[in-house]
Each structure stands twice: as C-alpha cells, then as structure tokens.
C-alpha cells in the first residue's frame, strides 16, 4: 500500500531513509498551505488526495530526476516537463507545494497500471501530468 505520509519534492534533505533506489510506485501530489493533500476537481468528482502524477521505477532515482528538473531546470522526468509546460497546473499547484508518497514493490509496472486504472475508473481521466500516457483500461 502506498504511504499516507507525504514529503516535499523540494526538501531532499528530509526525504525518508527508507526511500531507496529500488523499484516501486509513487504519486506526485499537490499540498494546500497547511501541508495537507489539496482537493482537486476531476471529471468524475473531487480527488481529495491531490494526485497529479502516478509513476513507477527506481523511486529515489526518479524523484531526484524530477526534483532536479523542476528546481534546477534540467531535462529528464516527463512529469516535470509536463508540469512546466502547463501554467494552469502551476497556478493551482505551485512548485513549492509539490510532494510525493511512495511504496516499494516487486512489480512496479503492474502496480502502476493498477493504480492508474483505479484512478481512471474513479475520476474518468488520468492524473493531469499522466495525460501524455495512453489509456490503460
């Protein structure tokens, strides 16, 4: 199960020790000013978890690539490029409020697909920074 705890993308020094460069799935989420997941309107309802992206891979490596892309302007993670290309998303989810939650697992591709499909069934669309992906249903 993916963690309920969230960690700011910008605060690498406070990323948890258990976040390793091992396979797993992660979600990029928007936080409100109080540091809680920000409710986001979707086609099929309100996403109270504030999910912007669902991804998989060697988690620490993927998140470092995303963090560098966002905060240092380097190329790399597709979610970072999608975020920087969409001012409307930046307006509702400022960079300072981007965070992640994660889980290590043995079959991250399968787990990612499962999480995306659940999201699509619930909200009628993929998370906004996953929009470049083909539908997985």
Feature annotation, model-predicted:
Residues 60-112, 120-122, 126:
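Acidic, metal/cofactor-coordinating or nucleic-acid-engaging core segments within structured domains
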Residues 82, 130, 134-135:
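A sequence-level detector of short, solvent-exposed, charge-rich linear segments
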